[in-house]
């Protein structure tokens, strides 16, 4: 059984590589791409509940379509890519993102596990750690809109099934400290700080409008504000629960303080 699964996975991987390299559409669209900053593509280190989806929508709208329609097409395809107007977009697929035939790509994958080609503008958006975890909890409680692509899994929603304290007991460290884990799977503050500092562009959820405007200027692209996956529900938490959460996410605050000391992340970057 194990060998059969590995054989199927290997065959699927080979088929993916063949399709990526033989389909001329994406290479044709991106062959001559050169953005204003000299890069050939943009890759987002996408941290959940930090406005990464909103940033993605700003790019997916460039072709003139409703960005939700573009996102739905990406999610419906095995290779998680599509085109819109003269632009190519890619998501999630490790090899596809490594190939580089897209204007904008993104994944939640840790940075150390995602190879990227040269001349890639790397972007990440950071958020106040307590606010991000609270937003993540509210998101699990409420779930996605019925027509939203990329629905959160029912198993993951169960993390928030019995209140905030139970959620803090259950949530795995990579989900609790997602910002740190994205840049260090060992959850090492120094390693994560160094990797974030190496990104081309870093800004915060709190300074999103300014960050998006600066990015649009840097790339010379007409990026406009698109809000997505904004959870309207705000769960009640006690001061004691907030204190507990602040203690649990202390490594992320330390990471943000180090970044701020180096002038990274913009003036709105929260440091605790």
Feature-to-residue mapping (PLM):
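PAPS-dependent sulfotransferase catalytic domain
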Residues: 29-30, 69, 76-125, 131-224
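N-terminal pre-catalytic "stem/leader" segment of glycosyltransferase-like enzymes
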Residues: 37-84
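A residue-level signal for conserved active-site and pocket-lining positions in enzyme catalytic cores
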Residues: 51, 128, 200-203, 215, ...
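Membrane-proximal basic amphipathic "stem/tether" segments
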Residues: 1-41, 84-91
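PAPS-dependent sulfotransferase catalytic core
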Residues: 29, 106-109, 223-272
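Aromatic-acidic/polar surface patches that form glycan- and anion
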Residues: 37-38, 45-48, 115, 192, ...
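Hydrophobic residues on the short alpha-helix immediately C-terminal to a glycine-rich phosphate/catalytic loop
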Residues: 58-59, 180-181, 259
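Short, solvent-exposed loop/turn segments at secondary-structure junctions
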Residues: 48-52, 62, 110-112, 128-132, ...
């Amino acid at each position: 059984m194990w060998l059969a699964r590995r054989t199927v996975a290997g065959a699927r991987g080979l088929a993916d590589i063949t399709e990526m390299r033989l389909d001329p559409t994406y290479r044709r669209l991106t062959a001559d791409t050169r953005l204003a900053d000299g890069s050939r593509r943009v890759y987002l280190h996408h941290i959940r509940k930090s406005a990464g989806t909103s940033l993605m929508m700003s790019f997916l709208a460039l072709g003139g379509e409703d960005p939700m329609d573009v996102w739905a097409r990406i999610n419906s395809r095995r290779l998680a890519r599509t085109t819109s107007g003269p632009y190519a977009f890619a998501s999630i697929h490790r090899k596809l993102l490594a190939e580089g035939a897209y204007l904008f790509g993104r994944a939640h994958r840790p940075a150390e596990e995602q190879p990227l080609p040269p001349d890639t503008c790397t972007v990440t958006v950071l958020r106040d750690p307590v606010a991000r975890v609270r937003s993540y909890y509210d998101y699990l409680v409420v779930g996605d809109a019925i027509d939203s692509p990329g629905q959160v899994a029912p198993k993951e929603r169960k993390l928030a099934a019995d209140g905030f304290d139970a959620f803090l007991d259950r949530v795995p460290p990579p989900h609790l400290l997602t910002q740190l884990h994205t840049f260090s799977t060992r959850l090492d503050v120094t390693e994560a700080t160094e990797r974030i500092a190496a990104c081309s562009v870093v800004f915060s959820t709190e300074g999103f409008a300014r960050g998006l405007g600066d990015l649009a200027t840097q790339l010379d692209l007409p990026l406009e504000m698109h809000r997505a996956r904004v959870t309207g529900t705000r769960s009640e938490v006690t001061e004691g629960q907030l204190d507990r959460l602040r203690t649990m996410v202390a490594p992320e605050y330390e990471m943000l303080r180090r970044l701020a000391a180096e002038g990274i992340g913009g003036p709105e970057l929260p440091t605790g």
